[in-house]
Amino acid sequence: AVAIDEVKRFIAQQDLNAETRFVPEKVIPKVDGEFEEKIAIIGGGPAGLSCAYYLAEKGYRPTVFEKEKQPGGMLMHGIPEFRLEKDVIEAEIDVLRALGVEFRCGVEVGRDVTIPELREQGYKGFYVAIGLQSGGRLGVPGEDAEGVKAGIELMREVNLEEKKSLSGRVVVIGGGNIGADVARTALRCGAEKVSLYCLEDYDSMPMGVEDRTECEEDGIEIHAGWGQTEILAENGRCSGIRFRKCLSVRNAEGRFAPTFDDNTTEEVPCDMVLYCIGQKVDWKGLLTGTAVELNPNGTAKADPVTYQTAEPDIFVGGDVYTGQKFAIDAIAAGKQGAVSLHRWVQDATLTIGRDKREFIELDKNNLLLEEASYDNTPRQRIGYNETLRKTFKDGRVAFTEEQVKAETARCLGCGASVVDPNKCIGCGICTTRCAFDAIHLHRDLPECSTMRSAEDKMKGILPYMIKRKIRIRRAKKAEKRNG
């Protein structure tokens, strides 16, 4: 596959240059100027910033309420700087300011001001995107010992420069991308030794291959296939952790149901345990005075297309609705949230003409593609500045322009088919034009339609077609005789 992340990084770096900085023009569909309706965005993370961007581009001046000292959410406070440099985020936020977005930082909705009070101030719509700010619980004895904390708390402390010093031996629990970030951050904060434990086996770890490789290159020990059973403590402080071997993580139905071998255990001495096994929403008093309903896991209930909650003027997006996902998912949700808010405050329909966002992943294991049929050029590799290893600076060396050209030339052009169901009239041309016979038409609700398939129609039409053909031929012969 093409190294799309590195190609995008190169393009983004060009966009950071002052002379090529892109600030979109506002598209204002009104003769008398911008929209005057006030919209409040609660949470300055990726979903909230995305929503603010698209609303501002459309002609609004939304207000973003952020409880921290600076906007950015998990992009700013949950991702280490050696992965995502803060000046990049700040540059993107500057674009929003240039578009007229107002930021009210240090204001926590639900504590400093409530949603009913904001309504009294004239706000007509609300977008709640506060993300998952709190770490879960380990659920084992001893987890209240000093030195045991959620990894996301460490990330927040380090990014806010409240803490950048650790010592001793650190155990990180969790094999996802956050676990990798926390482990590498702990090492950079001065930990003598960092070990990462997870339930999954080595090849099934949720973190990407690149994250795993970077952890190992930093000297982090990865122990796959282990589940914690107890935190060991001395005088109230963490002194170690006990694990047992994990045999399987999911059952036959694919549900999370780990099984263990109680006879195979391991006791690991350590001074700190950082767990990265999921996060949850901390609503506090945000929803006080509203009718917003919650799911059993604490996320908000909302329409899957419009993101509208049981409180009509409140919309949600990002992890607060979907649960833990990637930043790009939150950014996409923010765009759809902006569409819904625009329609809501303009008293328009929320549903007609919406992007249903159905994504069907390419089955890479079912490709009729012979390796000898294309130029199998090796993938471009990024360099690494070894002098920056184990520092908070990003040591990855971005692609040069020549590398970008070489990498994009590797694309096989499989393409992406975008289908808008709102515009499909069922003509069937796409099914006949597809060279790979990959498109087929199906009626979702046949009981609601009087349409008949072409095969069924031909059974009734064919006899009349033949009779008509015969009559036409006879008529032509009669004309010749009479002529």
Question: What are the roles of these predicted feature ranges?
Answer:
Residues 1-12, 70, 100-103, 406-446:
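Iron-sulfur cluster-binding cysteine motifs and their immediate structural context
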Residues 11-33, 91-111, 135-189, 294-310:
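Glycine-rich dinucleotide-binding loop and its adjacent helix/turn
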Residues 33-40, 90-140, 230-242, 247-250, ...:
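Feature captures the FAD/FMN-dependent oxidoreductase FAD-binding
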Residues 37-63, 179-187:
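N-terminal Rossmann-like FAD-binding beta1-loop-alpha1 element of flavoenzymes
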Residues 64, 68-99, 103, 158, ...:
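Rossmann-like dinucleotide-binding cores of NAD(P)H-dependent redox enzymes
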Residues 146-167, 231, 251-324:
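FAD-site-proximal beta/loop scaffold in flavoenzymes
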Residues 213, 219, 227-237, 249, ...:
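Mid-to-C-terminal Rossmann-like scaffold of FAD/NAD(P)H-dependent oxidoreductases
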